[in-house]
Amino acid sequence: MDEEEEEEVTDLKLQLFHNTVREHIIFLLLIILLYSSSYVVVSRFRRRDRDDLYSNDEDEVLVYRISFWLCTFTLAVAEGAAMLLPVSIASNEVLLLYPNSYYVKWLNSSLIQGLWNHVFLFSNLSLFIFLPFVYLFSESTGFVGNKKGILPRVYETFTVFMLMAIIVLVLTAVLSAVFGIEKLQFFWFLNLGSVHLPFLYSCVSFLGVMLMLICTPYGFVRLFGVVNQVLVRPMLLRDVNEEFSAFYMEEASVKRKLAHIELHNVSIADAANGGRLGNRIGLGRGRTFYPQPLLQHSQAHLYQRKAMASDVDELNDRLRELDSERKELDKLRTSSTFQRTFVYPLAMLLLLFCTAVTILLVVQNTLELLIGIKALPLSTRQFALGISSLSKLGPFGAGLEVCLIFYLGATSVVGFYSMPFMRKVCPKRRQTSLPQLMLNCGFMLVLSSALPLLSRIIGITNFDLLGDFGAIEWLGNFQIVLLYNLVFGTTTALCLANKFTATVRRELRARLVENYVLFTNYISFIN
């Protein structure tokens, strides 16, 4: 009996060891995959003249590469945070469909739980350590009096970073004492990892969720405009070839006018220079006299050239408009019939469907919170994968939840970068500097870390937030969750109503103004 028990214990230990090794291998493969995709994205946006500028300075090249690598890692963590809920929901449905399959034995609760814990850990490291350190490291020059090199810059960066960390941690301790989470004591730093750092991440997640409250409803509206710009709209009662020919002829006419004005300006300049050389009379050293008719002639040409300059500006503006319209028509001409007839309407219908379902789920979640049927998003029970489906519609409902989560992420990003204060920070292809990359990676990390919280708060899914994500204190506040649902649903409905009724309201306002003017004119005529 003792030998059998020892063999069972040994088998359990071996199984636990193999499971741990397998999970770490899966995590490593996921990190490599996410890092590779993030590297492609960051390389697409970064400005390459920085490498050429410091190609002869090895220290600057090393600093730039380290900063670039950590920015890429931060974006990879952001992608992982955005994928947490979809991967967890899909894993639960796969285990329900194939509970005894040999090929999904590696997919278990321990793997998903570890994935959430790793993403939470790397999110904290990237947000509070890597990004601040990278920014300070890229801007550092070393203390005064030290030689140039990497080590003096590391010393300066570490010193400034430690001072900033002390300030932030002291403020966090004060805020936690103000909100009643823990009393401020002399040895408050002993509870740094268990109380203050989770509270700091809770504050950051709250700011991220509030930012998504502003960006997501606006993104619902802006996404329709983005699809309208990217996809080719159907041609209803339009002869595109005839319009293209008309725009092409008008563009050629504008170009001829610009060439004629430029030739006329050159001839005027040559005539003025020739007249000055042939007709000027010297009246002494340093003074030149021009006859009166020549002065009048030059002034007349000056006025004429000013008028022509305004004409040139108008013609250039019109030429740019014609060029953009001609490109749009050319895209219409070269697009296929299937793309014009089916893709654009299907995309619009899909956006309308996702938006309508999101609003209905928010309304349902709000009513269930008021009645008391729905529990708060704070995780309170033990997690187990593959026991029951999270949706009443089964795999179809789970797939719909995954699509809605991705839709929320897309709308929040589109709405965030459509804000007026983000126009200068918005990344551009091959034109984004390293500080802008750091800032955008930080924003993406905050938004993606808040995406699971947003999806759980507004009732998109019933999947519990795992790990430390579900232990955020303010998720258990009924007033905050209910108010968030009310504001989110109301704001989204108002933004969509404003989007789809703007043309009708504008036309109605114009008609009312026109009728008012006619009525006032009629009254004044009678009087």
Curated annotation (Swiss-Prot):
InterPro entries: LIMR (IPR008075), LMBR1-like_membr_prot (IPR006876). This is Protein Lilipod. In the ovary, detected in germline stem cells and their progeny. Also detected in the somatic follicular epithelium. Residues 44-65, 139-160, 216-341, 417-433, 490-527 are cytoplasmic. It is a multi-pass membrane protein. GO terms for cellular component: plasma membrane. Disruption phenotype: Larval lethal. Conditional knockdown in the ovary results in progressive loss of undifferentiated germline stem cells. Coiled coil: none annotated. Required during oogenesis to promote self-renewal of germline stem cells, probably by enhancing BMP signaling activity. It is found in: Cell membrane. The chain crosses the membrane at residues 23-43, 66-86, 118-138, 161-181, 195-215, 342-362, 396-416, 434-454, 469-489. The lineage of its organism: Eukaryota, Metazoa, Ecdysozoa, Arthropoda, Hexapoda. One of its GO terms (biological process) is positive regulation of BMP signaling pathway. Disulfide bonds: none annotated.
